[in-house]
A protein has these predicted regions:
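Bacterial N-terminal signal peptides that target proteins for export
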Residues: 3-17
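Buried hydrophobic core positions in alpha-solenoid tandem helical repeats
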Residues: 39-40, 69-71, 100-101, 131-132, ...
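Structural detector for internal amphipathic alpha-helices that build alpha-solenoid repeat scaffolds
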Residues: 28-34, 50-64, 72, 80-94, ...
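Alpha-helical tetratricopeptide repeat
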Residues: 16-18, 22, 38-42, 69-71, ...
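Disulfide-bonded cysteine-rich modules in secreted/extracellular proteins
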Residues: 37-40, 44, 105, 136, ...
Length: 226
């Protein structure tokens, strides 16, 4: 067996054992940290979602040393690897990842675009504001909802009007996240549109609007939050 295959197998074994034994890792003897990071990135391609999630957590723990390999993985031929790399970069929160993640908002696979939007919301770098505003128009509703959520985390008032427009999105989960985002930004321009959203046909959207209003105008609305 080649060294590379042994390395990947060893890391996958490490991840699997970690899932079973209270998420504790079996040490990988004889491999450098860069070898482990490479193996974990390979694990992002696995069909097993638990292995992918565990790999993301391991990469998060690796911290800054994993950033450049993860940025490179955003160009992997495997969409699972690209999506996982985006999420892991968001967890690490290193500003080096911002521009590559912005580029990943144009990926042909919606899961990768959604992962990039999620990550940019975690990093909270204002360079992402305009690209995330554009992502509110993405053809995929999950990407739109993650973009709205990310803009709420960034709390930049440039996003207020575009997020208000998202309150009329055809998908309820997008409308709900748009309302939540407006509550985090706390801009008074959102009060009237959010008040109208209290009549939304979807209960989750109505509740999100009520919570947002309670954050923007607590004296008026806090008693009405369910």
């Amino acid at each position: 067996m080649s060294k590379n295959k042994m390395n990947i197998s060893h890391v996958l074994f490490r991840i699997t054992i970690g899932i079973i034994v209270t998420f504790c890792c079996v040490p990988v003897i004889g491999y450098s940290q860069s070898d482990e990071i490479h193996g974990l990135i390979q694990a992002l391609e696995d069909k097993n979602v638990n292995i992918r999630r565990r790999a993301i957590r391991e990469l998060e723990e690796a911290g800054p040393s994993a950033v450049e390999p993860l940025i490179a993985a955003l160009k992997s031929e495997k969409s699972r690897a690209r999506a996982g790399a985006a999420v892991a970069l968001g967890r690490i929160k290193d500003p080096r990842a911002v521009e590559p993640l912005i580029a990943a908002l144009q990926d042909r696979i919606s899961n990768v675009r959604a992962g990039a939007a999620e990550a940019l919301g975690e990093i909270k770098d204002t360079r992402a504001v305009e690209p995330l505003i554009a992502a509110l128009q993405d053809e995929n509703s999950d990407v739109r909802s993650w973009a709205a959520k990310a803009l709420g985390e960034l709390k930049d008032t440039r996003a207020v009007e575009p997020i208000i427009a998202a309150l009329k999105d055809e998908k309820a989960h997008v409308r709900s996240w748009a309302a939540e985002a407006l509550g985090k930004i706390k801009d008074s321009r959102a009060v009237e549109p959010l008040t109208a959203t209290l009549e939304d046909k979807n209960a989750d959207v109505r509740n999100s609007a009520a919570r947002a209003l309670a954050k923007i105008e607590p004296a008026t609305w806090s008693g009405q939050v369910k």
